Amino acid sequence: PAGNGRKYSVNGLDDDGNVDCRLHPLWGHSVALNYGFVFDECNRDAIKPKAFMFAAEGATAAGVAAQVEAAQVESGGFRDGDLATVLAGTNDIIEIYQRFPGESADALTALAAERGAQLARAVNRLVELGAKVIISDVPNVGLTPYALKERALHTDTDRAALLTRLTTAFNQQLGVTILLDGRFIGLVQADLQFRAIAQSPGGYGFVNVTEGACTVALPLCRDDT
């Protein structure tokens, strides 16, 4: 707790109210920290970075493919022992969903499946270039506060169910297209975990799984935060 009796760390803030990325690391940061590595983007202690960030705001499956090629060039090539972490697809699902009802649910489901396969091909490309990969599938977008709001706003169909359908199609093709033989790629089944949490939140220590945690736009983090 801070001197004013408030605890800022739960919001990712230090005692002075400044954003501190170390308090709530992204999962990629946590993986890197497990090996004693830091990213330049979250390096308030000025340690020499040995982990490198190629993620981009709003990236889709197509964007990840471009990021893979950029990482190959900027790193001078992947080497044995290099590990890449990948989580993408939510932006694809939202973009595809927003085409409804102009395009049919069946057509959009097929498109979501193709995007999942596209992301898988980008992951397989990482393996081809020499990296090992940990990839997470997409947590069910149909369980998000956004989905629940969309369901309340529209009466043409269950919009949350449609978002779940798109998520499932994406994840299924991702899972069957990646080179999943136990040697090169580890698949994090985040979707199953999030569905279990939504089904029985109390069992996982959650009280509220329907409302957004952030009611205002998040701050843009600087390299030192």
Where in this protein do the model-derived segments appear?
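Conserved active-site regions of diverse hydrolases
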Residues: 1-225
